[in-house]
Design a protein with these regions (language model features):
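Conserved SAM-binding loop
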Residues: 3-113, 199-201
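S-adenosyl-L-methionine-dependent methyltransferase catalytic module, highlighting the catalytic core
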Residues: 10, 14, 60-61, 82-93, ...
Length: 209
């Protein structure tokens, strides 16, 4: 990533320090929950980062219509939005020519569980269903799966354990064991199997916008 970056649904801003590269000039975090937006602002004030970190309390509609970004991120956010097609279309209007729109979302509708519903998920995605949301003026650059080990853990939880939500021990196991294993499995499977699906679109032109 480089230049100006927008993250929609930034939560508490935990992604920013890990994803931002030296090429990033400024990072805008959009978060509709005002309490969380305040936490991001507090975090931004504490950290010494080599770029400007801005916070917008609201949705993408709160942005200046003229604002343009070279990268727009939706990390585990799109599944929370009822009208996801309209959301991505509005996001694409804020892309610079040649800019990238990146979506990471939970995969496989058959894994949809009471836990998904309890945290406000409307759906999970397949490659096809995510690609079908390609916004006007954008072309699909890539679409792939992530977290192969997590897929099998989620399947076991759904079919065997039938747990409504993950326990603290399961989350710790996921972070410490499954994530490193997935880094290996994802490469071995050619990024064709995973708990999450990622799509990247590129803005082809600003003509007609």
């Amino acid at each position: 990533m480089r230049g100006q970056v927008l993250e929609v649904g930034a939560g508490i801003g935990s992604n920013t320090p890990y994803l931002a590269t030296r090429a990033v000039r400024d990072w805008t975090s959009v978060e509709p929950d005002r309490a969380l937006a305040r936490r991001i602002a507090e975090c931004a004030a504490r950290r010494e980062l080599p770029f400007i970190w801005k916070v917008v309390a609201g949705t993408i509609d709160a942005l200046d219509p003229a604002a343009r970004f070279q990268t727009i991120l939706y990390i585990d956010v799109l599944e929370h939005i009822a009208d996801h097609r309209s959301e991505l279309s509005r996001a694409a209007l804020h892309l610079s020519a040649g800019g990238n729109l990146v979506v990471l979302a939970p995969a496989h509708q058959f894994l949809f569980s009471p836990f998904d519903a309890s945290i406000g998920h409307y759906r999970r995605y397949s490659r096809a269903s995510l690609i079908a949301l390609t916004p006007p003026g954008c072309r699909l650059s890539s679409c792939f799966m992530l977290d192969a080990a997590g897929f099998f853990a989620s399947l076991a939880n759904r079919v065997l354990l039938r747990a409504s939500r993950p326990r603290a021990g399961q989350i710790a196991f996921w972070d410490k064991v499954l994530v490193p294993v997935s880094c290996i499995l994802d490469r071995l499977t050619g990024y064709n199997l995973g708990k999450s699906v990622v799509a990247v679109w590129t803005r082809s032109s600003r003509t007609g916008v």
